[in-house]
Structures are given as C-alpha cells and as structure tokens.
A protein has these predicted regions:
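Alpha-helical segment proximal to the catalytic Tyr-Lys
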Residues: 128, 172-176, 236
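Residue(s) in the substrate-gating loop at a strand-loop-helix junction
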Residues: 143
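Active-site helix of classical SDR
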Residues: 123, 159, 167
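Conserved glycine-rich cofactor-binding loop
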Residues: 9, 16-17
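Short C-terminal tail/terminal secondary-structure segment
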Residues: 1-2, 148, 228, 239-257
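Short, small/polar-rich loop/turn modules that mediate ligand/substrate recognition or access, typified
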Residues: 89, 175, 180, 238-240
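Substrate-binding pocket helix/loop in short-chain dehydrogenase/reductase
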Residues: 99-100, 107-112, 208
Length: 257
C-alpha cells in the first residue's frame, strides 16, 4: 500500500527500532519528512542512513521522552522550523517484568513516565500546533496487555491502558478542530521488546503465541501499515478508536484447548 504524505511533517518517538523504525521508513517512503526520536544514538544513525539511502527526508534527535521539557521543546522547534506539524506517533515504551510484590515504585513510575506521561506531553505540545492549523493526526501505540491481563506486567499494562483512555479524551477535545487521535493496540509482534520478554518468560511467550487465532505473531511492517492508515486521509472520519492489530487475540473469548 502506498500512502501520499508528500509535504507532511511527522514526529515518531521510539522511531529507531521495531514498529517505530518501520513506521519511520514507511512514512518517509510515502513522502513525509520524518523526525525520528529515540534514546540510542547508534540505532538513530542506522535509521537515518537507511531512510536517506532510500531517498527519504529525515531528521534524528536523541531524546528521552520522559524529559517533559525536552520533548515539548522538540515539538515546538520542529513546528517552528518546518512551519507545520501534521503527524505524530508516540511509540516509545518502557516495560518491567516482575511479580507485583517484587516491582518497585521506581519501576512503576518509569513505565508510566514513558508510556503515559510522555504521551500527554507530546500530545499537548502537538495540539498547540495542530488545532490552530485545523489539521493533524496522532497515533499512540498501546498494547493488548492494556485490555487483557498479563502476569508480571502490571506497570506496563496499567500505563498502556491509561494511554488508550487519554487518547479517547484528547480525540474528543480535538475533533471539532479537525485533529484526530487514535491508538493501535499491538499483540505479539516480533520486536526487541517481545524477544526480551520471550527470553525472560519463555513459557508465557510460547503459550501466548499458540493462543493467537491467526496462529502467528505479527511483524513490525503490519503495525506500520495500520499506523499509516490511521494517519492518512483514508481515515479522515476515524477518531478516538483503539484498533487491535493482534491476529484476533483480543476478540477471542476462550483459549484453544
């Protein structure tokens, strides 16, 4: 699927790996100028090189999204330099795997800082640009663990659930200004984060894969396509939704025997 994002400007956090990198590359291939943000410099530079080699327009910024002042300043700077901000994808994530009795308050706060509070920061800053311009689309990346319980992921699950409801509220506040906000809700996707989970909890990961109705995990390209759709004019009458992209897992009532 080819999307027409020519002339548009997009900010993607967590944009140098997995779902974020695939989204960055897809938007650039479709004509957008992509502002790729992540913490790790090496992966940022690799992403920049790949996009430029394919003829895309890209900037990279080393950013910890939990630094609210830095994130808000970046959004304002991008909008000022480019004269617009059309799209935002909040994909940066933090996860701690532990039983609740072993989870520390620092772990809890870190996951909320990245998965929920940073989405608030980025969305608020983007709204200040998009609402007066009467154009814009924001996609926030949640998780099926936000709507289905997963052991040992309490802080991650709770923060991703908060993200879904925040997105819906922000969508209602922005709808009259022609600014749309939606979530994608990935299931098991072949990313570094899920591979890390599989190493730490192999039995749970194996059972999760077996229980997917489509009998396979997803790949980052499939998530990037869903994100691009929600960002695009093809979704111009869609706002406030949480779109599962999970092979049917969240729709399933009973696990297979």
């Amino acid at each position: 699927m080819n999307w027409d994002f020519e002339g548009r400007v997009a900010i993607i956090t967590g944009g140098s790996d997995g779902i974020g990198r695939q989204t960055s590359e897809l938007l650039a291939q479709s004509g957008a100028t992509v502002i790729v943000c992540a913490r790790g410099l090496d992966k940022l530079e690799a992403t920049r090189a790949a996009i430029e080699a394919a003829g895309g327009k890209v900037e990279t910024h080393q950013l910890d999204v939990s630094d609210a002042d830095a994130y808000a300043a970046l959004v304002a700077d991008v909008a000022a330099r480019h004269g617009r901000l059309d799209m935002m994808v909040n994909n940066a994530m933090s996860v701690h795997y532990a039983p609740i009795e072993h989870l520390t308050l620092d772990h809890w706060r870190k996951d909320f800082a990245v998965n929920a509070e940073a989405v608030f920061t980025g969305t608020k800053a983007a709204m200040a640009v998009m609402k007066p311009a009467r154009r814009g689309s924001i996609v926030n990346v949640s998780s099926t663990t936000a709507i289905r319980a997963a052991p040992f992921m309490s802080s991650y699950s709770a923060s991703k659930a908060a993200l879904i409801q925040f997105t819906a509220v922000a969508a209602m506040e922005c709808a009259a200004h022609n600014v749309r906000l939606n979530c994608v809700v990935p299931g098991q996707v072949q990313t570094a984060g899920n591979e890390d989970f599989a190493r730490k909890a192999p039995e749970i990961a194996a059972r999760t894969a077996e229980a997917i109705p489509m009998q396979r995990g997803g790949n980052p390209e499939e998530l990037a396509a869903a994100i691009a759709f929600l960002l695009s004019d093809a979704a111009s009458y869609i706002t406030g939704i949480a779109l599962p992209v999970d092979g049917g897992k969240s729709a399933q009532l009973y696990l297979p025997s």
